[in-house]
Design a protein with these regions (language model features):
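A short glycine-/small-residue-rich loop at the edge of a beta-strand within enzyme catalytic domains
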Residues: 38-41, 45, 96, 100-104, ...
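Flexible, glycine/charged-enriched surface loops at secondary-structure junctions
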Residues: 59-69, 116-127, 155-164
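A conserved active-site cap/scaffold subdomain adjacent to cofactor or substrate pockets
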Residues: 81-106
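Histidine/acidic-residue-rich, glycine-tolerant segments that coordinate divalent metal ions
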Residues: 1-84, 168-169
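Short, hydrophobic beta-strand segments
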Residues: 25-27, 89-96, 126-130
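Divalent metal-coordination and catalytic microenvironments
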Residues: 33, 47, 92, 145, ...
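An extended, acidic, His-containing surface patch that forms the Zn2+-binding/catalytic region
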Residues: 127-175
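Short amphipathic alpha-helices in soluble, non-transmembrane regions
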Residues: 105-114
Length: 175
């Protein structure tokens, strides 16, 4: 998770690693022949709108200085070139540096997904798997660890990590 030289020890006060949550969205529409699109509810199109709406939400409703990432890793829909898709599956992760931002994104994601599905006549299922919390290093403990490491290997072999990473870390339960 880092590109720091071997033999160096980094420390970080405050937020060090992001929270991570998984999302699984299923859009249920009504498939049909591509020549009769008015008789269908195009789940693929609705799914695409969900992805672009979430990306727009992230860039316009989240403070740019408040690190947060919405990533779609899987988008599955359709089975033939001449058939309007009856379902779409969208899966990915949300990563944040603040608990308040995490809650805000998850709440609004549900509103966006439900709203778009309702607007286009589809139904949906949203599953959120809450993963790791934000790793926030205690200032007093970090200062103590920093001094111990500096005494052990020398101050010149230690450095303060400049910014938190957007990866998640199991160590968040201990920090």
């Amino acid at each position: 998770f880092n590109n720091y030289p071997c033999g160096m020890v980094g420390y970080k006060f405050g937020a060090k690693a992001s929270s991570t949550d998984e999302f699984y969205i299923k859009v249920i529409g009504k498939g049909g022949h591509a020549g009769l699109p008015h008789q269908t509810i195009d789940a693929l199109s609705i799914g695409a709108k969900i992805v672009t709406a979430m990306e727009s939400f992230m860039s316009r409703r989240i403070d740019p200085f408040d690190s947060a990432v919405f990533s779609v890793g899987i988008f599955e829909s359709g089975s033939a070139i001449n058939i309007v898709a009856d379902s779409a599956k969208i899966s990915g992760t949300i990563r944040c540096q603040k608990d308040e931002t995490r809650a805000y994104i998850l709440k609004n994601m549900e509103q966006i997904v439900n709203g778009l599905c309702q607007a286009y006549g589809a139904t949906c299922k949203i599953d959120i798997i809450h993963g790791l919390p934000v790793q926030v290093n205690d200032a007093e403990t970090t200062e103590y660890a920093k001094k111990v490491v500096e005494q052990a290997i020398g101050k010149e072999k230690t450095f303060e990590i400049p910014q938190p990473m957007m990866g998640a870390e199991d160590f968040s339960y201990y920090a």
